[in-house]
């Protein structure tokens, strides 16, 4: 029996990035494709509560020119994973693959990331996870019209590392392998093991004076101090060295110092 891979994302079940990821690994495993019905970027590992949350709709995703069955879940990426594991899957997935995300997931933004939120939810069910994200301009990161991207470098990374994890498992104390692929990467771009930066690649800008009784969405802008990102970090790797960043992430958030 082939292994079962749960594919998900935070950009929505019809995202070309999700289809590209499925195409990259479809020969290695049976695929269960379950993702939010709509764009859910920056939802983290949240579980919103509303009357429509948890509704599930089957749909077709075009993968390599062929239709594959997928499921859209009304809710966050983490909710999609939970419903996939608890209701849709007929057996426990061997691996969760989250992406390919429009926009890098690095530094302090990791806790905001729906891509990583889905991966952490999978690991909470005992499923190892890989997250794959492509560096794109900020204005594309929340887009629901899915601008065209070159996914090939991301697909190569996914295919190689999925095979490796299925064969060998994750390294000790690792919950997720977090891959970030820089703009312009190709088959010659090396992979570098990095650590999570203490900076962010973007920040919220201060709003102009406005009536507080009206709804408002904070806007992001590039971090003007990005060049202060630490050497050896995920941000430094993709923004300045232009290499593929691989950050092994753990589940335990406890600090090493200051604990009894």
Residues covered by each model-derived region:
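Hydrophobic/aromatic beta-strand patches that form the interior of the parallel beta-sheet core
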Residues: 32-34, 71, 97, 128-132, ...
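Short acidic, Gly/Ser-rich segments with clustered Asp/Glu that frequently serve as metal-coordination loops
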Residues: 11-19, 211
């Amino acid at each position: 029996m082939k292994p079962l891979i749960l594919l998900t994302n935070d950009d929505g079940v019809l995202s070309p990035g999700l289809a590209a990821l499925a195409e990259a690994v479809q020969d290695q495993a049976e695929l269960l494709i379950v993702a939010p019905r709509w764009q859910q970027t920056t939802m983290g590992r949240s579980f919103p509560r509303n009357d429509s949350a948890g509704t599930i709709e089957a749909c077709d995703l075009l993968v390599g020119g062929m239709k594959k069955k997928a499921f859209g879940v009304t809710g966050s990426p983490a909710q999609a994973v939970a419903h996939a594991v608890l209701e849709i899957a007929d057996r426990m997935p061997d691996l969760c693959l989250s992406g390919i995300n429009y926009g890098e997931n690095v530094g302090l933004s990791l806790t905001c990331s729906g891509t990583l939120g889905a991966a952490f939810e999978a690991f909470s069910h005992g499923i190892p996870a890989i997250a794959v994200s492509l560096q794109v301009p900020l204005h594309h990161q929340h887009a629901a019209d899915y601008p065209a991207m070159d996914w090939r470098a991301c697909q190569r990374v996914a295919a190689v590392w999925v095979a490796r994890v299925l064969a060998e498992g994750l390294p000790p104390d690792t919950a997720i392998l977090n891959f970030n692929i820089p703009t312009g990467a190709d088959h010659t771009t090396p992979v570098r093991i990095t650590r999570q930066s203490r900076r962010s690649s973007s920040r919220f800008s201060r709003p102009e004076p406005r009536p507080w009784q009206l709804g408002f969405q904070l806007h992001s802008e590039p971090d003007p101090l990005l060049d202060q990102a630490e050497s050896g970090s995920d941000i430094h790797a993709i923004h300045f060295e232009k290499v593929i960043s691989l950050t092994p992430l753990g589940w335990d958030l406890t600090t090493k110092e200051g604990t009894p």
